[in-house]
Every structure is written in structure tokens, then in C-alpha cells.
Regions:
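Conserved SAM/SAH-binding beta-strand->alpha-helix loop
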Residues: 115-116
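Conserved class I S-adenosyl-L-methionine
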Residues: 83-92
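Short amphipathic alpha-helix with an adjacent loop that forms part of the alpha/beta core around
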Residues: 146-156
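Conserved SAM-binding loop
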Residues: 119-126
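Conserved SAM-binding loop of SAM-dependent methyltransferases across substrates and taxa
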Residues: 93-105
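Conserved SAM-binding strand-loop segment of SAM-dependent methyltransferases
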Residues: 131-144
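N-terminal auxiliary segments of SAM/dcSAM-dependent transferases
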Residues: 2-40, 47
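Class I SAM-dependent methyltransferase Rossmann-like catalytic core
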Residues: 34-80
Length: 164
């Protein structure tokens, strides 16, 4: 039985207490030049917008990174452990991870992102396209301590490979 046939499990290690979130927003808005931390824009709509921005001709980092990985994927993959736990930090729509799965053949994909619903949808797509790979999503805020030990401990013998 494939583990990925079920919807991916989501772990949530996210969020300051609501009062702290409010304080964070107020502190930014009361600055001489008002600002809101970008993490507050990462809901479903914000994630979809960022995905579209990454596809613009003017936004070259995504294309540049993809070309580097394409040129060196085989050599990089050869240096990685067999059947790792592929941990994609800030996975977004998981498009970068999808490009690595054939080369890396991970035992499991752990997508980490701040937007829970978008993450769940992205991990479900990975699971549908790769039914033999277990998929887990971890919802967290990178401005807080990253807590993955308990998730990684579920698959001893499969070392993590962190990907960003």
C-alpha cells in the first residue's frame, strides 16, 4: 500500500499567540515608513501571486536557479544519500522539488511553508504524481525556530536532505 494515496499529513508548528501577531503588525505600521512583514501576505492568494511573479521574464532568479540545477543535477544527486527525506524549505508550489524526485528518489518529501492551505494543495499534487513517495507538509514560520526533529525521527535510516 502506498503511503501517498491518502492526502498528505500536515504538521503545524506555526504561529505566535494572536496578541504577539497583532503587536508585530502594529509595530510595523507605526514605523516612520509603515511596513508589514511579508509573511502576512502568504495566504492562498499571496502564494499564487508569488508563483506567477516567479514565471515573469523580469524575475530571473527562478530561471537561473533552474538552469544551474538542470546542468548539475546528476552530479549533485550522486553526492546525496540513498532514499533520503527530502526537506523542501519554503516549498511553495513544490515545482522545484518535482524536478529532483527522479534523480534523488527520496523515501519521503517533507514540504515546509508558512501557508497551510497552499502547502496542503501543493503536497497533494506531489503525492498524486508520485504515489510511491510519502508526503508530509509542515506549516511553520521561518522567523521562529524550525521544529522538524519529531517528523524526521519517524523515518530513521533515511537522512534528511535540506533543499531551499
Amino acid at each position: 500500500m502506498s503511503l501517498a494515496l491518502d492526502l498528505p499529513r500536515l504538521e503545524t508548528t506555526l504561529r505566535l499567540p494572536a496578541q504577539d501577531e497583532l503587536q508585530n503588525l502594529l509595530q510595523g505600521l507605526l514605523q516612520p515608513t509603515a511596513r508589514i512583514d511579508s509573511k502576512y501576505f502568504y495566504d492562498d492568494r499571496g502564494c499564487a501571486l508569488f508563483t506567477n511573479i516567479c514565471r515573469l521574464d523580469e524575475y530571473y532568479p527562478t530561471r537561473t536557479e533552474a538552469q544551474i540545477f538542470s546542468d548539475h543535477r546528476e552530479a549533485i544527486s550522486a553526492q546525496l544519500p540513498d532514499a533520503p527525506q527530502w526537506v523542501d524549505l519554503g516549498c511553495g508550489d513544490c515545482s522545484k522539488t518535482q524536478q529532483w524526485l527522479n534523480a534523488v528518489q527520496p523515501a519521503r518529501v517533507i514540504g515546509v511553508d508558512i501557508a497551510g492551505e497552499f502547502l496542503h494543495s501543493s503536497m497533494a499534487a506531489v503525492a498524486r504524481e508520485n504515489p510511491d513517495i510519502e508526503c508530509v507538509g509542515v506549516v511553520c514560520d521561518f522567523t521562529q525556530q524550525l521544529e522538524l526533529e519529531h517528523v524526521l525521527a519517524e523515518r530513521p535510516g533515511h537522512p534528511p536532505v535540506f533543499f531551499y
